[in-house]
């Protein structure tokens, strides 16, 4: 009798499985870190849109003393126009030159931009003070040199010496006026340099004085939309039930999240119902896209939707810094993904009622509609595949 040995299937060593799991986890955490860190690491403080009031000569003088490309200046006729531009979200702040220099900020638009403009005001004040001191020193030097002449001569203190003093004072005044519009000659008795006033046109609320709450609110809203999409995809079947679940989630989730953000923490301001509607639209749009991708391509669609929302849309949403600071063109792209759209709408509803948010609302509706279309297409695709298999 012969004995035939059955070959045993080869099994990989256990340590290889452990190594593979560790490598996959390492790659995953590195991708997550890169996704969230690179917008900040590559950000550049430049091209901040700011309104400016003053003559071209004054604007040129101030511009020459600033780092190149720091600000994108938009000349306006007067202070009122600058304030209107801030309240409509056309600019982040304003610089008023002339006899009463002033820096206009909006901490509600961006605490980072507000701090930067405050620094610009500090530098302007330093420049004005230096010009005044230089003018006074020049006047004193000319007075001292004129005081050494013989009495009654050409350099007598009451004649040419006084003229020299007046000329020096006029020169100092001209310098101060070019920088910020001083009213008095720096060398004149009792002359004081103009003070650069800083005004927060649209301040943050007392409940969120540093804007940190509004900045981090985008993450739970993004995760909320993603979690809703995943749960609906896994727990609900059928196109009608999918769409009904998305609609109900948008309504209930919007009311609940807005209630927490506004009623509990005071992060959101103004009308609660408007904030709830915007919040619900945002999370419904995210959930809709994830459900649609899952219906169309299966379980990988959930991963695609999560990556698009969490690891692409959220880091470039510009909730923590102006979009102009994010590496182009990603700052602008982020404003048309759901996290950026939701953040902009909620910020404007809370603090900038004069801002036009129609474009952002329609864009969110567009994302919601895209998810619905993908859901319907996926349903018909699955039905066709089932009929083919049965036939």
Predicted features and spans:
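Terminal targeting segments of Actinobacterial cell-envelope proteins
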Residues: 1-16, 192-206, 331-334, 343-344, ...
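Hydrophobic alpha-helical transmembrane segments of multi-pass membrane transport/permease proteins
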Residues: 7-45, 219-227, 310-314
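Hydrophobic core of alpha-helical transmembrane segments in multi-pass integral membrane proteins
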Residues: 30, 253-258, 368-377
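Alpha-helical transmembrane signal-anchor/signal-peptide segments
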Residues: 41-57
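Transport-system extracytoplasmic interface segments
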Residues: 57-70, 84-231
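Short beta-strand-to-loop elements that line the ligand-binding cleft
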Residues: 71-78
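Transmembrane alpha-helical segments that form the functional core of multipass membrane systems
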Residues: 210-318
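Generic detector of multi-pass transmembrane helix bundles and their immediately adjacent loops
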Residues: 292-391
């Amino acid at each position: 009798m012969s004995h035939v040995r059955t070959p045993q299937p080869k099994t990989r060593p256990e340590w290889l499985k452990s190594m593979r799991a560790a490598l996959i986890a390492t790659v995953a955490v590195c991708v997550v870190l890169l996704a969230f860190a690179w917008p900040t690491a590559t950000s550049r403080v430049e091209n901040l849109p700011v309104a400016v009031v003053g003559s071209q000569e004054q604007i040129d003088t101030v511009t020459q003393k600033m780092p190149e490309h720091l600000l994108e200046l938009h000349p306006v006729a007067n202070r009122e126009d600058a304030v209107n531009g801030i309240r409509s979200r056309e600019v982040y702040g304003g610089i008023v030159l002339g006899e009463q220099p002033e820096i206009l900020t909006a901490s509600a638009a961006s605490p980072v931009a507000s701090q930067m403009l405050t620094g610009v005001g500090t530098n302007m004040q330093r420049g004005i003070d230096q010009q005044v001191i230089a003018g006074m020193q020049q006047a004193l030097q000319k007075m001292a040199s004129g005081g050494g002449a013989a009495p009654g001569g050409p350099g007598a203190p009451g004649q040419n010496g006084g003229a020299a003093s007046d000329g020096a004072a006029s020169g100092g005044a001209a310098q101060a006026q070019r920088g910020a519009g001083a009213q008095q000659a720096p060398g004149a008795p009792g002359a004081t340099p103009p003070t650069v006033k800083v005004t927060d046109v649209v301040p943050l609320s007392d409940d969120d004085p540093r804007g940190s709450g509004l900045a981090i609110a985008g993450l739970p809203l993004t995760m909320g939309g993603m979690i809703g999409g995943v749960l609906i995809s896994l727990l609900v079947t059928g196109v009608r039930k999918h769409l009904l679940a998305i609609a109900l989630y948008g309504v209930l989730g919007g009311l609940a999240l807005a209630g927490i953000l506004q009623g509990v923490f005071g992060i959101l301001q103004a009308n609660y119902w408007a904030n709830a509607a915007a919040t619900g639209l945002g999370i419904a749009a995210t959930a809709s896209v994830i459900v649609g991708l899952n219906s169309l391509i299966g379980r990988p669609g959930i991963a695609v939707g999560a990556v698009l929302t969490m690891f692409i849309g959220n880091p470039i949403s510009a909730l923590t810094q102006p979009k102009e600071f994010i590496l182009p063109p990603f700052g602008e792209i982020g404003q048309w993904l759901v996290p950026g759209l939701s953040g902009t709408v909620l910020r404007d509803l809370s603090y900038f009622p004069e801002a036009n948010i129609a474009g952002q609302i329609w864009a969110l509706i567009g994302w919601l509609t895209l998810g619905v279309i993908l859901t319907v297409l996926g349903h018909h695709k699955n039905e066709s595949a089932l009929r083919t298999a049965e036939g």
